[in-house]
């Protein structure tokens, strides 16, 4: 996950990146009656509260703040329901529970069947929980102030003349060097907060960061800013996976469901809808 509380609380194709517990299962083992569930006949899904867009949508209701995971709207809500359908569950058979981000991948028993909450796979986390294969590969993105010249750019080539800000040692920095190749050296900062401040103060024309961070920057940190676009890459290797109790055989069945959603184009359609069109982060080429 990106290092900001708002988005966990990133777009590239969601190609299969295997994680701990990341094998697929036979059809018979994944029949609804054979699934290893917290409550028989019900799929219990965890996520944090508040539930923020574009990962979740719908209006704030009852126990849920900002958005409502039960709406089926927003990227992660839509993915969860698509997986549930492949496993044989109706929408009414899916129960959402509140699980604080940091406890979702902590060691020990789980009250959920899987948790979906912009959780990045890491080897350390995978030692104590199972991860599904990737359902989202984190892209890089570019943030600009509205009304500036760069805000009219629609291709990567059009970014070359501008002063780009970035945190040193990040995949964002590497992407600038390898792909954008600006005509002037990027402004490099020790922290992302410093790079954000430079954009806010007009010292740079744009900020390059991962997409989840870009959502946070535009929503909270830099007034009158927007995501100009995202870059067609998953090259950083960072990806989000659903989290399960360690050893839960349901992991393999969810991987099988994800494989089907990737193969029939459903996962890409969900991503295009909620992270490009609705969220206003078009892909720049």
What are these regions (language model features)?
Residues 8-21:
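Bacterial lipoprotein signal-peptidase II cleavage site
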Residues 13, 26-27, 32-33, 171-187, ...:
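Ligand-binding clefts/hinges and TM-proximal coupling segments of bilobed small-molecule sensing domains
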Residues 25-115:
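Extracytoplasmic small-molecule ligand-binding "clamshell" domains
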Residues 45, 50-52, 70-87, 119-123, ...:
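Bilobed "Venus flytrap"/periplasmic-binding protein-like clamshell domains
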Residues 79-81, 86, 163, 170, ...:
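Extended ligand-binding regions for polar small-molecule ligands
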Residues 92-158:
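Acidic, polar ligand-binding/catalytic clefts
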Residues 103, 119-128, 177-178, 200, ...:
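A ligand-binding cleft/hinge motif common to bilobed small-molecule-binding domains
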Residues 137-144, 212, 219-259, 277-285:
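Periplasmic-binding protein-like
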């Amino acid at each position: 996950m990106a290092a900001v509380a708002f988005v966990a609380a990133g777009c590239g194709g969601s190609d299969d990146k295997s994680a701990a517990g990341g094998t697929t299962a036979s059809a018979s083992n994944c029949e609804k009656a054979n699934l290893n569930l917290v409550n028989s006949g019900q799929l219990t899904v965890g996520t944090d509260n508040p539930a923020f867009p574009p990962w979740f949508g719908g209006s704030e209701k009852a126990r849920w703040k900002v958005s409502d995971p039960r709406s089926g709207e927003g990227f992660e809500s839509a993915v969860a329901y698509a997986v549930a359908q492949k496993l044989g569950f109706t929408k009414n058979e899916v129960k959402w529970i509140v699980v604080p981000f940091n406890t979702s991948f902590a060691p020990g028993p789980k009250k959920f069947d899987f948790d979906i909450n912009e959780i990045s796979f890491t080897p350390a986390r995978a030692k104590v929980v199972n991860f599904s294969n990737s359902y989202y590969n984190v892209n890089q993105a570019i943030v600009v102030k509205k009304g500036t010249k760069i805000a009219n750019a629609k291709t990567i080539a059009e970014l070359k003349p501008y002063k780009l800000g970035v945190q040193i040692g990040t995949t964002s920095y590497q992407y600038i060097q390898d792909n954008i190749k600006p005509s002037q050296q990027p402004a490099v900062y020790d922290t992302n907060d410093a790079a954000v401040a430079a954009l806010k103060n007009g010292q740079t024309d744009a900020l390059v960061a991962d997409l989840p961070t870009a959502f946070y920057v535009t929503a909270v940190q830099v007034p009158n800013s927007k995501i100009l676009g995202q870059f067609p890459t998953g090259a950083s290797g960072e990806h989000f996976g659903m989290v399960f109790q360690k050893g839960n055989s349901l992991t393999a069945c969810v991987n099988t469901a994800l494989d089907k959603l990737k193969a029939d184009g459903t996962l890409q359609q969900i991503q295009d809808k909620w992270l490009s069109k609705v969220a206003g982060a078009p892909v720049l080429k």
